[in-house]
A protein has these predicted regions:
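Basic, helix-initiating cap at the start of DNA-binding domains
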Residues: 2-60, 69, 73
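Solvent-exposed, amphipathic alpha-helical segments
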Residues: 48, 52-59, 102-110, 194-205
């Protein structure tokens, strides 16, 4: 039974990996030919490389992990690994993509109807984010650690940030009448940047998002938005 559950989890992750390969821009960073490896053997090897990198990142700084390390952990010949990922950065970029999908899916389960005011919903989103990092510290490491691969120059990180902001914006507009002045999405992006900055500070000081900095991020985010949003937004009828 447990083996079947594990197979289902692997299939789910691999489906997400297939989505990456369909994305033409991201695929250029991951594989030379995005349609090349669809066989069961190819999927299994790609999955082993991803999980090998993830396991190594539990105990080692990401920047210290080499492609050779991942191949050894995964039991995949290095020559074969190049068919799936051109370098170690591509493996961690793929993991970051998978993490982002999972984070978005979890945050989408936070229902705005469960909270009387927008402050409660925002607090729940922030707390749920930290809960994800508590459950899997490798996710926080890949986002906030100083020793992560340099992904600057691609729009991937920005795209993920925008998707989170879009999610929060959609939930707010579904429930509340938002002010017609200013750009609320831009306000939420600034809010996200405030939260992200405080989380980064916490992680780089303590290698985790501490309760203190979780509270600081929540206070700062709500305080900023209170400059533009009333305490009680009118609800849509």
């Amino acid at each position: 039974m447990s083996e079947q559950v594990n197979d289902n989890v692997d299939d789910k992750v691999d489906d997400k990996m297939e989505d990456i390969l369909v994305d033409s821009e991201l695929a250029k960073k991951l594989v030379p030919n995005k349609f090349k490896f669809t066989s069961q053997q190819g999927r299994a090897r790609r999955q082993k490389l991803l999980m090998g990198a993830k396991k190594l990142s539990e105990t080692k700084a990401i920047n210290d992990i080499t492609l050779a390390d991942v191949c050894e952990e995964a039991g995949i010949p290095r020559a074969s690994a190049y068919h799936f990922f051109p370098n170690i950065e591509a493996i961690f970029l793929a993991l970051r993509f998978l993490n982002a999908i999972e984070i978005l899916e979890i945050l989408a389960t936070v229902e705005i109807e469960d909270y009387d005011r927008w402050q409660g919903y925002l607090t729940a989103i922030i707390e749920r984010s930290v809960g994800i990092f508590y459950d899997d510290s490798t996710k926080a490491k890949l986002i906030y650690d100083t020793n992560t691969p340099d992904f600057e120059g691609d729009s991937f990180g920005e795209d993920i940030d925008l998707q989170i902001v879009e999610l929060v914006y959609e939930r707010l507009t579904q429930r509340y009448e938002l002010p017609n002045f200013g750009d609320v999405k831009d306000m939420l992006m600034v809010t996200f940047s405030i939260i992200n900055g405080i989380f980064t500070l916490s992680y780089r000081r303590y290698e985790e998002i501490t309760d203190k900095y979780l509270q600081e991020a929540t206070i700062a985010a709500i305080a900023y938005l209170r400059c533009y949003l009333p305490e009680n937004l009118p609800r849509k009828k």
